[in-house]
């Protein structure tokens, strides 16, 4: 059975999709078989746009699991929060369906990288959030952060919440693209590296530039 790792971010549009493909490619270069999965995709039809991007970054074609929907169990047309998109299409999101899809993939691949939608507190129904899913499934986490002003606050809040919920931190990926202010980016990187080294000594810190 392969290892399932959740990928989330400190905010929406933080670079999770690129980071997921980046990390998948990195594992592939180490000799592992890797598949990515999208928990929920909104603003899309037919095949998840994020899955397509993952495959481009991995340098592979779409898989059979992509074409039959296993790598993205929930696909909604309207570009909004998952809970609203599901409500609009009268298609409630069931965590069991996502978990079953991940388990199927884990039977075939060494690693399954499961990318979430938005940040940790994004709701996928009226009662449950992404964080709830990670905790319930006991999944290790890759957290994607950025060099933008304000990201230290968002990153630390996310890490503190994960610590409180005893979530295993697999890695933190520091996305430097787009580089808006080099001085802020370097200072933020140094601060986060030191913080993670002190509070999460077993967590890998990776820097990702434009892919």
Curated annotation (Swiss-Prot):
Cofactor: Mg(2+)
Top EC group: ligase
Entry GO CC: cytosol
Metabolic or biological pathway, per its Swiss-Prot or TrEMBL entry: Cofactor biosynthesis; biotin biosynthesis; biotin from 7,8-diaminononanoate: step 1/2
GO molecular function, one term: ATP binding
Alphabetical list of PANTHER family matching this protein: ATP-DEPENDENT DETHIOBIOTIN SYNTHETASE BIOD 2, DETHIOBIOTIN SYNTHETASE
Family: Belongs to the dethiobiotin synthetase family.
Protein name from the UniProt record: ATP-dependent dethiobiotin synthetase BioD 2
Species: Haemophilus ducreyi (strain 35000HP / ATCC 700724)
């Amino acid at each position: 059975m392969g290892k399932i790792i959740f990928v989330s971010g400190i905010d929406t549009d933080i670079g999770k999709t690129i980071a997921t493909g980046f990390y998948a490619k990195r594992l592939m270069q180490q000799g592992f078989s890797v598949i990515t999965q999208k928990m929920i995709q909104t603003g899309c039809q037919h095949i998840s746009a994020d899955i397509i991007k993952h495959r481009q970054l991995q340098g592979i074609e779409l898989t059979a699991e992509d074409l039959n929907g296993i790598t993205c169990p929930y696909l909604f047309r309207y570009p909004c929060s998952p809970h609203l998109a599901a409500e609009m299409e009268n298609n409630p999101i069931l965590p069991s369906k996502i978990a079953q899809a991940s388990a199927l993939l884990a039977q075939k691949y060494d690693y399954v990288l499961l990318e979430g939608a938005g940040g940790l507190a994004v709701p996928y129904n009226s009662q449950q959030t992404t964080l709830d899913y990670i905790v319930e499934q006991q999944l290790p986490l890759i957290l994607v952060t950025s060099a933008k002003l304000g990201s230290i606050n968002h990153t630390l809040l996310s890490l503190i919440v994960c610590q409180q919920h005893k979530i295993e931190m697999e890695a933190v990926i520091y996305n430097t693209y787009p580089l808006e202010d080099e001085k802020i980016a370097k200072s933020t990187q140094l601060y986060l590296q030191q913080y993670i080294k002190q509070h999460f000594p077993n967590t890998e810190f990776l820097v990702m530039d434009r892919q």
